[in-house]
Amino acid sequence: MWGRISWCSIVALLVATAWAAPHEGHDHGGHTSDHHHHLHHGKDDPHPSHEEMDACHLLAPHNADFAFSLYKKLASSPAVEGKNIFFSPVGISMALSLLASGAKGETHSQIFSGLGYSQLKSQQVNEGYEHLIHMLGHNRDAMQLEAGSGVAIREGFKVQEQFLKDAQHYYNSETFSVDFSKPEAAAQEINKFIAKKTNDKITNMVKDLDPSVLMMLINYMYFRGKWDKPFDSTLTHKANFQVDKDTTVQVDMMKRNGRYEIYQDIENHTTVLKVPYKNSTSMMIVLPDDGKMKEVEESICRHHIKNWHDKLFRSSVDLFMPKFSISATSKLDGILKEMGMTDAFDDKADFSGLTKEVKVKVSQVVHQAVLSVDEKGTEAAAATTIEIMPMSLPDTVILNRPFMVLILEDSTKSILFMGKINNPTA
């Protein structure tokens, strides 16, 4: 089975004062999308250094704390009540860290504080993402994982050369010119870039562009993984999924009996199951007891994840899991302000590390993530696996009510994606 997940976040920067027509010499140095940056380590090097591991692991606990803080804000937002939640915590952190590399003073401090990086130096964060992107970017037969950035710059707008160099070097960023004064054409060009990077999974993210936008920072992540042990499509059947006490939907329910890591956290009213992809990535499924989702959402944090990891044990499990394909889009402006990042959106924003030409501020931060889960796949469909099962009654895990998912990358200790499947058919 190939699980396909795509993510993209957009940070749009608007001028905070009157924007005059550009004059000669005020451009961003001819940076275009014609060249594709490869990290100097070499993406084909399969052996990350201790330095790379340490740099990634330095960010991991801060990124996990940010992930759960952001999840709780999203889950409690009236705008997403009853809806699916899905986002890439590490992608959002990466986009905001790129933004922070062009911020100064209180604006920079607020972004770093909101991300949990107050005790870290900018260089540590930049190098952490450089190594993280490198380590995530190893494409293997059973897995494809790509992460990087794009910087779309208004034609004639002058951007600090150091910012562009850092964006390319640390954040695997490509830079290209866009005529934002023609919003429809600009949106089409940016959407084309995003579609290419997400394997056409996210195709129409940017629309209704403000013609006064000067710059757009884009972060993308694309993941395609094959289950370590695929589901047999002949066992997939129709079943009910209880969205809430008043709503039941019918889903295609996959079934598999196999050895899985499982833990029943009685104290926290949760069953936790780890379903591995091939290589170093896995899906952690968190299934709260009936009526306990809100309680679990309010309390869950990175310490739960570590505790569950430590207590998981291999057991025979009858797993029933719905096939689904969901897409979630959210504006993060309000949530990020609640997390203390206020100046970036205000006229007092200081992005002098990004441009000295005019005062700019962030106009909006938008993210979109797409998750598809099924039992099919080119290799998986042809694969045959045999497991030796113990002669004992298996545990039964039926995902027929809302559950949480976390896509974890073990070598970097990263939460690549997380969310709540509230309605697999929505």
Region spans (language model):
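Detector for small/aliphatic-rich hydrophobic stretches
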Residues: W2-F180, T378-A381, I421
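Extracytoplasmic/secreted cell-surface and envelope-processing proteins
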Residues: T107-I111, M293-V296, A328-S330, I415-F417, ...
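Short Gly/aromatic-enriched secondary-structure transition segments
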Residues: I111-L115, F231-K238, V296-N307
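Structural recognition of the beta-strand scaffold that forms the well-ordered cores
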Residues: F86, M94-S97, M283-V286, L406, ...
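C-terminal soluble interaction/assembly domains
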Residues: H367-A369, E375-A426
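Hydrophobic/aromatic-rich, well-ordered segments within soluble, folded domains that form packed cores
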Residues: F86-K104, S212-W227, S414
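Non-catalytic, conformational "gating/processing" segments within enzyme and secreted inhibitor domains
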Residues: H28, G82, Q119-G291, D310-S392
